[in-house]
Swiss-Prot record:
GO terms for biological process: positive regulation of transcription by RNA polymerase II; response to unfolded protein. The gene is hacA. Keywords: Activator, DNA-binding, Nucleus, Transcription, Transcription regulation, Unfolded protein response. Residues 85-138 are annotated as: Basic motif. Residues 30-40, 192-210 have a biased composition (Polar residues). Homodimer. It is found in: Nucleus. SMART domains: BRLZ. InterPro entries: bZIP, bZIP_sf, Hac1/HY5. Belongs to the bZIP family. This is Transcriptional activator hacA. Residues 41-51, 77-91 have a biased composition (Basic and acidic residues). Its main location: nucleus. Gene3D superfamilies: 1.20.5.170.
Amino acid sequence: MSCDMEKTMSSVDSLPATPASEVPVLTVSPADTSLNSADVKTQEVKPEEKKPAKKRKSWGQELPVPKTNLPPRKRAKTEDEKEQRRIERVLRNRAAAQTSRERKRLEMEKLENEKIQMEQQNQFLLQRLSQMEAENNRLSQQLAQLAAEVRGSRANTPMPGSPATASPTLTPTLFKQERDELPLERIPFPTPSLSDYSPTLKPSTLAESSDVAQHPAVSVAGLEGDGSALPLFDLGSDLKHHSTDDVAAPLSDDDFNRLFHGDSSVEPDSSVFEDGLAFDVLEGGDLSAFPFDSMVNFDSEPVTLEGIEMAHGLPDETTCKTSSVQPGFGASTTRCDGQGIAAGC
């Protein structure tokens, strides 16, 4: 028996050895256990089970006449009623499609017309632009020619021999000089000649003899009392030749009233001037013969009363009475009035 076993082993060893790659692998993969094979079978079965696609009918096909007359709001139940509803839907769709096509056609026509108009306008603007460019080039050339001619004329024009005197500019120095105060001694005042003024009215024609202590006299002192004399009449150079009686003769009450107050009657005198000067005191009643300049003294040297005796019309202050010094009702107590008449003696 042992011999048989040895023979068997030797026979097995004597068999040719098979490569390992030829040995079948007895393993189970996860793909073999999946359900992909079943899905493939179902996919293969589905196309066969699908219903054939509904064939769309051609446009313009005549529709059959519906067999029923179902109201619009009633639900279709029978096959004839359903066919009626289908025919109604087709008719509505055809009408809507026709309306849509017509609307699109009108819109397209409108757009085409606008396109044509814009093309024409664009063409016109291009032509206008070309014309303006040509005009601009022509004007630019003319401007260049004129500029060249002007430069040539300036170059050929000779320069003047003596340049124009430059006008003085406004500098702060000029303004400062204008602001400086000019003294009165440097201001020239024209002195008119005494021959130009020939007064026709003299104080001697107005003066009358009266009591000196009872009637006020004409004051020749200044309004401010600064000692400067302001005579009422311009005597000029005749002051040296006339007597002092003509100069210092006092005025009477009548003359005084006629000169400064006018007539005291109820009816106003038409010959009285606004400042109280009566026209009847003038020679011939002519106002033009009595210039106002005769009231002003243009002598450079003021006339003083130092050389005039007080007995000829200007009494001494000590001889005046206290009652005559008191001003009248309404008169100023501080200074004389504008006519140069003293409030008192």
